[in-house]
Amino acid sequence: MDIEIIAIGDELTSGRILNTTSSFAAKQLFEAGYEIYGMSTIGDTPEVIGEALKRSIERVDAVLVTGGLGSTDDDLTNEAVSRAFGLPTLPNLEILSIVRAHFAQITDAPVGQLEKLAWLPEGAEVFDPQSGMAGYQLIYEDKPIFFLPGVPHQMKALMVEHVLPRLATWHTHRHVSTFQRVFRIFNLPENEVNTRVSRLKLTNDVHIGYYPVFPEVHLSLLIRDTNPKTAKRLFDSSCRAIKTALGDHIYGYDRDTMSQIVGQALVKRGMTLAVAESCTGGLIAQKLTDMPGSSRYFLGGVTSYHNSMKTAFLDVPERLIEKEGAVSPEVAEAMAYGILEKTGADVTLSVTGIAGPGGGTLEKPVGTVYIAASTPHGDWVNAFQFKGSREQIRELSAQHSLDILRRYLLQDI
């Protein structure tokens, strides 16, 4: 069953408001096994709305429309529907009575203006008139069109409680088994991910998508089939093939985060972690403590941004900083050892670098970063030369730090 999504609102087409309703609807429909034909965003112009509706209803099985159902002058969706399909607008008496009795008491808007909410195209089946939320279904040429408010929390509630159940019983819907997974990949460029997966020569029934989400690459795998056993077999074999092709560059799946995976690995091994940060300014600690229960494995950290803090809190020798510079492998190693001595953690990470935009030299340009780790199995320092903005360099530094620890914890130790 093909479905098209139309979002209406000048605030969307002008970029003033982010269109979150379409992405929510698409995700809900996709996970329920429907095909998304397309999504469009149009302004509050009746002629444009009408043309969009007529085009959509000709090419898909159902249409989902959000926005333009309110009581203000720029809410023109109902008017556009009536014009496009040649339908009179009629008052919904239940909504009308609610508007008069309730809304008039909680807003200064004229009752006559609020009554606009109750005037709907003939044949409109209101989802939840008692709630006062705009939203209805209209059948046109034996196809359902769902109209939802543009207010995100109202739209989401009606989508889940009314639209999805109605779609599930619609006679044109065939049940399709859907299996999907998102592979979260780090430290492998998108083109290399594509090259490796392309070599697998997966069948046309395997749908692959690549999505760069800085600083990661997300690969989506989708299998659909009317036979659930066939779909599951193909899904499992495709997952195995992708894992083999990408190896430990895959750090997690679906909604996993790097800090979550690192935390789980630390808990599994019964190990604790502490961090010493300079150029990342506490970003690693923030990522770790974003996870509930992180106190089980994360002891804490020191943000030693100024050189004096490196000496005072991490016991990094002043002479070492003067000789090698604050951004150096020697200082990174000393920071990792210093936080180890202060906290007694099983493993420690440290990072020092030049995030920019200033501070770089010919020998150490902006983006020079050193990440050190101290573990029961040895210490080491990794050198990086990152590109990008200050924020991107900081993010890359934090993510690579966690990835270094993840790879260490994956080993047979």
From Swiss-Prot:
Q: Which Gene3D superfamilies match?
A: 3.30.70.2860, CinA-like (3.90.950.20), MoaB/Mog-like domain (3.40.980.10)
Coiled coil residues, start to end = none
InterPro entries, A to Z? CinA (IPR050101), CinA-like_C (IPR036653), CinA_C (IPR008136), CinA_KH (IPR041424), Competence-induced_CinA (IPR008135), MoaB/Mog-like_dom_sf (IPR036425), MoaB/Mog_dom (IPR001453)
Record-linked Pfam families: CinA, CinA_KH, MoCF_biosynth
Q: Which family does it belong to?
A: Belongs to the CinA family.
Name the NCBIfam families for this protein: cinA_nterm, PncC_domain
Q: Which HAMAP family match?
A: CinA_B
From the Swiss-Prot or TrEMBL record, give the protein name. CinA-like protein
Tell me the classification of the organism that encodes this protein. Bacteria, Pseudomonadati, Thermodesulfobacteriota, Desulfobulbia, Desulfobulbales
